């Protein structure tokens, strides 16, 4: 009799995805982040569910309900900080996952990559709306500033912003709908992640060399299941250390002040994982131009397959492209730092130069370097 694992309609799907899946024999730890993102998503949905049991999405009680969760609910403080810092871990894994894709040319799997870009936008939208829910000063003013950006859209902008707000300012209607969307989006993300995997399994995984690995495949289980478990243990170790020793390290102290529409904080800034995009937004003096640059800073990822001019897929054997890739990483760190600084000299000019370099590297320098490498290899 055939193994039930291979015949049962449900078990068969799991088997073909996580057990008998043929995987390249040489994929490194950079390929661990897909499973880590899955763990992060499950953790966020579970902790979020338990938080939603005690949270109230009303402007009068939202801040108090979060305080109540931390003070009165059994292990409420743990659930709340796991959720808040879990978001940070989620984004760390996301950035590393995308960086891996850029370095090793994984974007050549067009469908998988494009769904990944949509997933990135969805996670960013979810995180933004989640940050509004505790209804602290940064929640309120962050929501006001970011939603206001839509008013830069010609003709329909103002109406669009008021439609999203559900009034003439960020208020009760805004908070309620943000809670509703923040609750539903992770399930949409989970469904999209399933489609992401579906398309990945149509082609099989890429590998560090960028060469086809059809001649050398190994089963996913036990080789990569045990490797993923190690990755998961490290993720859990880092997250629990963060939550138990310095839960507010990555947060903003201003969010412990209840939202007050009459008092603007001196420096409005988003969570650390949005700072690079925020720096690009602020570096353009024009409102519409800034919004377009902000959107394009992420959307440019969708152009990566079109900008690939090299005859090789991976950067493993391309030293010039490697240098430019790490320059891009350094540039993103610079943008993240600038995004958290006040708008004054010398931060303004540093941010503008870093923003120009960001787009120059992706759109101009890296494609040229790839062509140069082709010529150097006489290809």
UniProtKB/Swiss-Prot annotation:
- Give the binding site residues for heme b b562: 83, 182
Give compartment(s): Mitochondrion inner membrane
What CDD domains does the record tag this protein with?
cytochrome_b_C (cd00290), Cytochrome_b_N (cd00284)
Q: Name one GO cellular component term.
A: respiratory chain complex III
In terms of Gene3D superfamilies, this protein maps to:
Cytochrome Bc1 Complex, Chain C (1.20.810.10)
Keywords tagged on the record: Electron transport, Heme, Iron, Membrane, Metal-binding, Mitochondrion, Mitochondrion inner membrane, Respiratory chain, Transmembrane, Transmembrane helix, Transport, Ubiquinone
Residues involved in a ubiquinone binding: 201
Q: What cofactors does this protein use?
A: heme b
Regarding the membrane, this protein is recorded as: Multi-pass membrane protein
One GO biological-process annotation of the entry reads: mitochondrial electron transport, ubiquinol to cytochrome c
Predominant localisation class: mitochondrion
Binding-site residues for heme b b566, renumbered to this chain:
97, 196
User: InterPro entries per the record?
Assistant: Cyt_b/b6_C (IPR005798), Cyt_b/b6_C_sf (IPR036150), Cyt_b/b6_N (IPR005797), Cytb/b6-like_sf (IPR027387), Cytochrome_b (IPR030689), Cytochrome_b_C_euk/bac (IPR048260), Cytochrome_b_N_euk/bac (IPR048259), Di-haem_cyt_TM (IPR016174)
Q: How is the cofactor bound?
A: Binds 2 heme b groups non-covalently.
According to the UniProt entry, its GO molecular function terms are: metal ion binding; ubiquinol-cytochrome-c reductase activity
Could you confirm whether the keyword Membrane appears in this record? yes
Q: Where does the sequence pass through the membrane?
A: 33-53, 77-98, 113-133, 178-198, 226-246, 288-308, 320-340, 347-367
Role, per record: Component of the ubiquinol-cytochrome c reductase complex (complex III or cytochrome b-c1 complex) that is part of the mitochondrial respiratory chain. The b-c1 complex mediates electron transfer from ubiquinol to cytochrome c. Contributes to the generation of a proton gradient across the mitochondrial membrane that is then used for ATP synthesis.
Family to which the UniProt record says this protein belongs: Belongs to the cytochrome b family.
Q: What else is known?
A: Heme 1 (or BL or b562) is low-potential and absorbs at about 562 nm, and heme 2 (or BH or b566) is high-potential and absorbs at about 566 nm.
Give the quaternary structure: The cytochrome bc1 complex contains 11 subunits: 3 respiratory subunits (MT-CYB, CYC1 and UQCRFS1), 2 core proteins (UQCRC1 and UQCRC2) and 6 low-molecular weight proteins (UQCRH/QCR6, UQCRB/QCR7, UQCRQ/QCR8, UQCR10/QCR9, UQCR11/QCR10 and a cleavage product of UQCRFS1). This cytochrome bc1 complex then forms a dimer.
Entry protein name: Cytochrome b
User: Species name for this entry?
Assistant: Dymecodon pilirostris (True's shrew mole)
Gene behind the chain = MT-CYB
């Amino acid at each position: 009799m055939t193994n039930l694992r291979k015949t049962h309609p449900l078990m068969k799907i799991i088997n073909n995805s996580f057990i008998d899946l043929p995987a390249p024999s040489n994929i490194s730890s950079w390929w661990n982040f897909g499973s880590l993102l899955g763990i992060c998503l499950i953790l966020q949905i579970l902790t979020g569910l338990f938080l939603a049991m005690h949270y109230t999405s009303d402007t009068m009680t939202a801040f108090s309900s979060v305080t109540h969760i931390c003070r009165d609910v059994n292990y409420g403080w743990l659930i709340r900080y796991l959720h808040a810092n879990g978001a940070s871990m989620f984004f760390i894994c996301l950035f590393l996952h995308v960086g891996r894709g850029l370095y090793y040319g994984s974007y050549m799997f067009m469908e998988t990559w494009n769904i990944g870009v949509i997933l990135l936008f969805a996670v960013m939208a979810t995180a933004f709306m989640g940050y509004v829910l505790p209804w602290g000063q940064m929640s309120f003013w962050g929501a006001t500033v970011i939603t206001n950006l839509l008013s830069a859209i010609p003709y329909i902008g103002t109406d669009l912003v008021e439609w999203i707000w559900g009034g003439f300012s960020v208020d009760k209607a805004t908070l309620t709908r943000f809670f509703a969307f923040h609750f539903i989006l992770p399930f949409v993300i989970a469904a999209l992640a399933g489609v992401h995997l579906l398309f990945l399994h149509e082609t099989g995984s890429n590998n560090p060399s960028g060469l086809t690995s059809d001649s050398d495949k190994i089963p996913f289980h036990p080789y990569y299941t045990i490797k993923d478990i190690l990755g998961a243990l490290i993720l859990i170790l880092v997250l629990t250390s963060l939550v138990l020793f310095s839960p507010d390290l990555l947060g903003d102290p201003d969010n412990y002040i209840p939202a007050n529409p009459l008092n603007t904080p001196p420096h409005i800034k988003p969570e650390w994982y949005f700072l690079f995009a925020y720096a690009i937004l602020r570096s353009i003096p024009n409102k519409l131009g800034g919004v377009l640059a902000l959107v394009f800073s992420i959307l440019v990822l969708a152009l990566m397959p079109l900008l690939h001019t090299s005859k090789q897929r991976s950067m493993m054997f391309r030293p010039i492209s490697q240098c430019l890739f790490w320059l891009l990483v350094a540039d993103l760190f610079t943008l993240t730092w600038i995004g958290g600084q006040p708008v004054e000299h010398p931060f303004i000019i540093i941010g503008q130069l870093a923003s120009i370099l960001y787009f120059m590297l992706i759109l101009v320098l890296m494609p040229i370097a790839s062509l140069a490498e082709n010529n150097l290899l006489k290809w």
